[in-house]
A protein has these predicted regions:
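A short alpha-helical cap/connector motif
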Residues: 1-133, 138-159, 163-226
Length: 226
């Protein structure tokens, strides 16, 4: 009986395949001692296709790590597009920048180093983002969602990663700060009138998790939208 790992391997092999640039990015990330918490290949291609489906030309990524998903976004926005990626750790950002140069997409990516809470306000007044991907410290999910709406516009796509946490997101009594952050994010998406959202559970080699998908329906008066 095939396992979910077998299915993940089959889908990756069949729908994603092998890419020397992306493989090198992961190798460089691991060689630098970064944690193996990047999005899985099938999920990365999902984000890539979602970006293309949305026609996104400006993408905001909160949580760069080694730049693996950043490369996927940069390829999706194409020439003339722009990806702004925020990374709290300067060592991670250095690895990401090297990976982006190797991938030939560094000219369309701006990696900004600092805590999301500090960097996001500096983006106010810039052109609105078409898609926002949130994959950083889970405790700050609601802060990042608020900024996603403020820096977006009606129609901006928002993706919030790691929202199921092995099913623990359904536990209202959890004391795990990451799970609490995931819960607060889901509750905000379900109650904040600026968003229309849903969520999907995922099961792959990294285990049981999920992703929330939303669109901004009203950026609000504080928004930086066009």
């Amino acid at each position: 009986m095939p396992t979910h790992d077998d299915v993940d391997a089959f889908l990756t092999r069949t729908l994603v395949g092998s890419d020397p640039i992306l493989d090198a990015a992961l190798s460089a990330q691991h060689a630098a001692g970064l944690p193996s918490i990047e999005v899985a290949p099938v999920n990365a291609k999902f984000l890539h296709l979602l970006t293309r489906i949305a026609g996104a030309r400006r993408v905001l990524e909160i949580g760069t790590l080694g730049g693996y998903s950043t490369i996927w976004f940069a390829r999706a926005v194409g020439e003339g597009g722009r990806v702004v990626s925020i990374e709290a750790e300067s060592a991670n950002a250095d690895v990401a920048r090297a990976n982006l140069r190797r991938a030939g997409v560094a000219d369309r990516v701006d990696v900004r180093v600092g805590r999301g809470a500090d960097v996001l306000p500096t983006l106010e007044g810039e052109e609105a983002f078409d898609l926002v991907f949130i994959d950083a410290d889970k405790e700050s999910n609601t802060l990042y969602l608020d900024w996603a709406a403020r820096l977006g516009r009606p129609g901006t796509v928002v993706v919030l990663d790691n929202v199921v946490r092995g099913g623990d997101v359904a536990d209202a009594d959890t004391t795990d700060s990451k799970v609490q952050g995931a819960r607060r994010g889901i509750l905000m998406l379900g109650s904040d009138p600026r968003f229309d959202a849903t969520a999907l559970q995922t099961l792959d080699r990294k285990g049981w998790d999920g992703v929330a998908l939303a669109i901004v329906v009203d950026a609000g008066e504080a928004g930086a939208g066009s």
